[in-house]
Each structure stands twice: as structure tokens, then as C-alpha cells.
Amino acid sequence: MRPQHEPVVTQRAVRVECIPDGRPADLPAGTPAKITQALGGSFTLWVEGQLMRLRGADADAIGKRIPSIDLAPTAPTDSGLNGVRSLVWQTLKTCYDPEIPVDIVELGLVYVCDVLPMDGGQFRVTIQMTLTAPGCGMGESIADEVCDKVLALPQVGEAHVDIVFDPPWDRSMMSEGAMLTLGL
């Protein structure tokens, strides 16, 4: 049984990214679409047989409010290294591949997440992550989203995300919860 997808119509012209190649496209006002995924602050749309990613900042283009990602209920009280490390990992769990309804941590895409103190009480975050397929055109977009969300944390002064392919990703890297969600 296929999940129900919410039909929408663009209310203004908007820039989107085509999935899976990541190329930009412009949707004119009045374009019918279906929301197939609304996770991590962005939307995946089905438009005329093509999946497209709409940034959360452009949610008004489909009549939606800009999604907010609230980490406050689970934010650690420890403002030191361990607390910031925990907050960074929580933030990574708000990042999704636009084709898969499981976050990048549960998918096993994050290989390294180093959090190091800097002068002035802030932290430098270095992340090495992979993609489910080496040819995925959305890699840069996903990495940019990861970097932007981590940099939005007030404790983080610098963030860098590298896409790596060694070791190559495979399904065994997913959490049990991810496998259950995907029916594997």
C-alpha cells in the first residue's frame, strides 16, 4: 500500500533541487505537486514524475510554514565538550536524505564527528560522512545542510563536512530502527 501524499500547488515561483542529480530547477507559480516527505526542515516534492527538494526557508511557496527544528527539549545542560558533542549528534539526526525517511545517523552515513575546543569557548566540528550511492547528486546539498545546521548551534564557531567513500556504505551500516522503518 502506498502512503498518501499531500497535494499542493506552488503559490509563487520557487527554486528547487532535482533528485537524485541535485541540479537546480525553477517551479513557476501554479505548479501542482505532492509532498512525499517533510523531514528535517525540508520538503521532498513529486512534480510531473520528478522528485524535487524544496528548502524549508521556501515553505511558503507551497502554503506551509517554515519548519523549525527545536533541540531545546533534549539539549544537554553540559556546555562543555561532552554536552556540545551530544548536541551536534542530535543536530545530525535532523538531517535526511531527501529520498529516504530515515536520518543520516540512523542510516549509518556519519563516519566521524570530531568536536574540538577553540579559543573563546566555542568549538570546531569536523564531520566525515558518506552517501548511500557514490554517484548521488544530492551529496553536496546534504553536506551543506549538515554544515549549516551544525554552524547554527551557538557553541560552534567552525564546521567542516567532508564526503568520503571509504569504507563504501552498505545496508549493514544502518541501525535496526532504520531497517525496520524501511521494511528491510
PLM regions and their residue ranges:
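Domain-level signature for proteins that mediate thiol-based redox and metal-cofactor handling
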Residues: 1-184
